[in-house]
Structures are given as C-alpha cells and as structure tokens.
C-alpha cells in the first residue's frame, strides 16, 4: 500500500529516450506504460476499516489465475491483470470510482508533478564488496599478493570473538524493491496512456513499476 493518501498508477517500464526543450537542452526520460489501470475493489471504512482503491494492470491468461482470485475479479467484472496493488486514498477520491472503472493517467498525474517510482532493481548476482558496497581496492604491489580486491579484515579481537551482524561483505546484489523519489513528470501521452518521467526509474525494460505522487516533494528552487 502507498505511504500517503494518494492514488497512484501501475505500469510497465518501456525504456529510456530523450526529449529536447525549446532551448535545445536534452532531457533524459523514462517511458512508463500506465494504460488499462482498472479498479478491482473499493474498500470503505464501514466494511474494511480503512479506505483504499485496489487496482490491477496488464492482462493474464485465465488458466494462470487462481480460483479465489478469479472469483474476486469476476465480482468486480474486471479482466485478470498481471499485478494487483492497493492505494490508500481519501473517501472523496474513493467515491469517484467503482469496481471495474478505468483509471486514466490524466486523472492522477499532471505535467511538472513530482512522483515516486517503485520497482524491482536489476539483479546483479553474486558481487564483491567493491561493486556491492563501494569498497576500494587494496595495493596493487608492495608486498600485496592475491589480495587486491578482497575486503580485508572482517573480525574483531578475542572479545567479542565474532563478526557483527550487518557487516558489509560479499553477497547477492540487486533484485530488491527500490523507490526513486521526487522525479518530474515531463510529458503525458493521454492517447497512448504513457508517462514520460525525467531520469531513470528502478528495474529493467518490461519490469513493473508503481508510480505515486511524491511523499516528500521538494520545493522548487528559490522557494522560501
């Protein structure tokens, strides 16, 4: 669920490109497909104890949907999607939608708005401390043999005689949920339901992302 009482959209990362301003400046943008967002359930304070909108995105074969989920979607009259997420909203926002209703991009976002984009970062596999934790290499010579890229000492003395939990070491890198905050919406293509967001967003091409109004939106430069 979102961290604020704001409706967001689910989408798929299409890729990156650049736009040019009237002054000729190049602006790198990520294209996010947010088409066919639809409401699967409207939760209310009376029935559920809180107010939210449950939204799905994409399409999925009927054979890949569990029976409980199929019944839930059939009740809403909605085609099965690839992902389902829930957004906490105000009662006023929830009152604008009913189960089965589409959520167009223009209802949620506007050009110039700050957004937070959440996705799954690209998996890098097993990585060393230099790549994983930005460690520096050891000396290339002067007596250093076969220890150029190792982390070095990881332990303590006889007391406590153990490696503390959380020690930065080698291990799996990437493939975790990441949120990039305060990105600008540069352009909205309402016909194709595309969001063009300034900068990079987490994940690989084709990965699912969740776009929300920024929780900690930064004030513009020059503001008091």
From Swiss-Prot:
InterPro entries: Ribosomal_uL3, Ribosomal_uL3_bac/org-type, Ribosomal_uL3_CS, Transl_B-barrel_sf. One of its GO terms (cellular component) is cytosolic large ribosomal subunit. SUPFAM superfamilies: Translation proteins (SSF50447). PROSITE patterns: RIBOSOMAL_L3 (PS00474). Gene3D superfamilies: 3.30.160.810, Translation factors. The modification N5-methylglutamine is found at residue 158. GO terms for biological process: translation. One of its GO terms (molecular function) is rRNA binding. Signal peptide: none annotated. The keyword Cytoplasm does not apply. Belongs to the universal ribosomal protein uL3 family. This is Large ribosomal subunit protein uL3. It comes from Acidovorax ebreus (strain TPSY). The gene is rplC.
